[in-house]
Structure formats: C-alpha cells, structure tokens
Amino acid sequence: DEAAERAAALVELLSPFEADEGKAPAGRTPGLPGMGSLLLPPWTVTRYGTDGVEMRGSFSRFHVGGNSAVHGGVLPLLFDHMFGMISHAAGRPISRTAFLHVDYRRITPIDVPLIVRGRVTNTEGRKAFVCAELFDSDETLLAEGNGLMVRLLPGQP
C-alpha cells in the first residue's frame, strides 16, 4: 500500500532526529495544542496558576464513541492530563496518578467549544487531591473528575 510505504519512509527519514524523553517537545510545549503531544487532546492552556488550571478546546470526529458524542474513554485522558498540570502548577514535584474517577453528567458533544477547569483541593504529605470540571460554552456541566496524585519517591520511575 503506497500510503504505508510513504509513512515508513517518513519515519526512517526522521529517525536521526528522535529526541530522548524529557527533551522531546511532546507534552513539554505549552504554547502548542495538546502541549505538542499527539496523544493528548489538542486543547490550549488558558490559565495556569497555583490556584488552578484552565484549558479550552473541542473534540472532533476522531474522538467519537458513537452518535456524534465524545467516547467515554477520552474524558479520563483529558482529566488525567489536567490533574498532572494542576499538581505541577501548584508547585508540587513530579507526581503519578494513583486514583482517577469520572462522573459523566451529560453527553459531551464534538465540534463545540469546551472548557475544563481544575485545582488541588487538599494535600497530605506526598498526596495531592485534585478535581476538575468540564463545561460547554454555556457553563453546563458535562463531566467532573477527581483524583489522587502521589509525589514520586527519589529514583522512582
């Protein structure tokens, strides 16, 4: 198949430029949608501070689970990404998600502007309890999530 051959040739052409983890732009470029990661939803950070984080964006046909609604598994990815940013914005060291819970309140549509806002709600030693809400442009609550981020121990992968 010609498309597959071209894709393979492109991968080979770019292979000398592969960057190590921590040096690649993916997930490290806040000015790009999805922070430069192909995995993350292509949203843009609009507020980033110790009191919380806000992102704006939309989902497309690539995120559909059926009937023009966002696939339910996409929202935990959005919230997990948000929880990591919330923890970092609050000045906490690198942490890992220990728990993530999502409540789906309404169908999340594609191709409409959406807003997600989140914050740290409590801290206990290595633990940061976080929450976030997903809204449409009318501020209708579509989903909400809460989670637990745990600071990594020295040398922990």
Task: Please name every model-derived segment.
Residues 47-52, 70-92:
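Active-site helix/loop of acyl-thioester processing domains in fatty-acid/polyketide metabolism
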Residues 1-26, 108-110, 121-157:
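HotDog/MaoC-like acyl-thioester-processing domains
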Residues 57-59, 104, 151:
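Hydrophobic residues in beta-strands and at strand termini
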Residues 2-69:
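Long amphipathic N-terminal alpha/beta scaffold segment
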Residues 38-41, 98, 128:
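Short, basic and Ser/Thr-rich N-terminal targeting/leader segments
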Residues 82-114, 120, 142, 149:
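Hydrophobic beta-strand-centered segment that forms part of the acyl-chain substrate-binding groove
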Residues 48-50, 95, 111, 125:
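Short coil/turn motifs at beta-sheet boundaries
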